[in-house]
């Protein structure tokens, strides 16, 4: 059954913690440094975190590592997104298929997933995984969770990814399942699940009052680096309008609600923080 396939794939993959640790070891390894000389394959500065303006880092009670930052399929992301994609994606999926099994239509089952994603006291960004442990509702995490949900659905059914309907990753072969022809190590099948929604600079978190001021200062101090990172193909800095449009686009997953949180005019977007003195009269 589709549920059995999804559970088998989930069980075959390392859990979120070990997956993140594996990636950390890889991107920080000497082998990666030799393969990409002159490049920082994974950037991490655990001694100057985004919360060091506080006398005590509140994440110390919950966080056991500081995830590196790296680029995958042209998207900047933190290593924690891998754990969100697999673990939380599977949680979303089980909620979805359980709702279907209870007789709910697909739209109702999807609504149940979003309710869990945005309001569960433990596993939502509004609860322990977000505001309580980090002082933030991470829209990047929400997007990775949702992409993982789409991945588990796409194992056995067509799913819209990046606005295009994609065929299943596995197909029936008599009584068994086998990988579809497009699922091969040398194809881009997995790139369809990774998007700029995972980039917490382009798709910022909604910070609580304790964190917001320090985060805004940290972003502003890094304005030159941020604008250089997102420069265009001619190495020119992009205009404010680019970041306005990008932030607006990333509020949904190509039109689908994935549980994005925060008012548009209150989020610490690049457009708002890195372009001081500009009146916001041309966009959200």
Describe the residue ranges of each PLM region.
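Alpha-helical transmembrane segments of multipass membrane proteins
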Residues: 125-126
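Intrinsically disordered, low-complexity, mixed-charge
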Residues: 1-119, 129-142, 146-284
